[in-house]
Amino acid sequence: TNRTGFNFGARFSAANDVYHRVTYGISTSKITNRSTSATSITGENGKSLLKSAVSYTIGKDTRDNYFDPTEGFFTEISETFSGVGGDVNFLRSNLRGGYYKPYLFKSLVLGVKGRVGHISGLGDDVTQSERFFLGGRDVRGFDSNGVGPRDKGSGGAVGGNNIYSGTVEVVSNLGVTKDAGLRWTVFSDFGSVWATDFPSGVTKPDDQAMRSSLGLGILWNTVIGPLSFYWATPTAEQSHDNTKTFQFSIGTRM
């Protein structure tokens, strides 16, 4: 998908670590590199669509560090309404949260996080560029967008209207020199994405089967930010999924 546009908004802090955020965005999107069957799958028919949307988020965050939390929790609910003019009309709902608990004087941290999401068309079907996609950092061991329904013609991911994912992870510096800035992690990821308004030509569009993986990682705090190296293997997958053993990222680890 080729997408251009901009967003602007404001965040307001309240008592007890609660925050509110309001955002407005306008953008145009167009599906490119489609297979013969993908025109009916995307719902966009090669057109450039204008989206005008407003979002509201409320959350609570008590984590001690946004990039590298060792204790605390966060929870966030967001609603996005698209239909303030434009060609795209939908309501998207997201709920996400996480919890972090230190042990052994913070030398070992247990982290649990998860998210669920749903998008509904308002008088229109949900097009591909607005659906949820899963894989990569969300479910390590799978390629980016590697989980879920796929175009039978091109094999490309087409996304879904429903999503959930979660992670259980242990991070520790036990056995590592403190000044090195290195830690190790073991983790399990899981999730699924499914349901499209254009099921023709799609592989298993309504398959809700959970995918999962197990893996190991190395986390390194550097002057340019946290670096993460992950090795993971799927423990539950579908034949049409795309897997990926090694992944690298810069920034937040969970």
Q: PLM features: residue spans?
A:
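Residues on the lipid-exposed face of transmembrane beta-strands in outer-membrane beta-barrel proteins
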Residues: 6-12, 26, 54-60, 79, ...
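Hydrophobic core residues within well-ordered beta-strands of beta-rich domains
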Residues: 52-54, 73, 93, 110, ...
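Outer-membrane beta-barrel transmembrane domain signature
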Residues: 107, 191-214
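Gram-negative/organellar outer-membrane beta-barrel architecture
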Residues: 1-76, 90, 140-141, 145-152, ...
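Extracytoplasmic gating/loop element in the C-terminal half of outer-membrane beta-barrel translocons
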Residues: 106-195
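Short loop/turn motifs that connect adjacent beta-strands in outer-membrane beta-barrel proteins
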Residues: 14-21, 64-73, 86-88, 102-110, ...
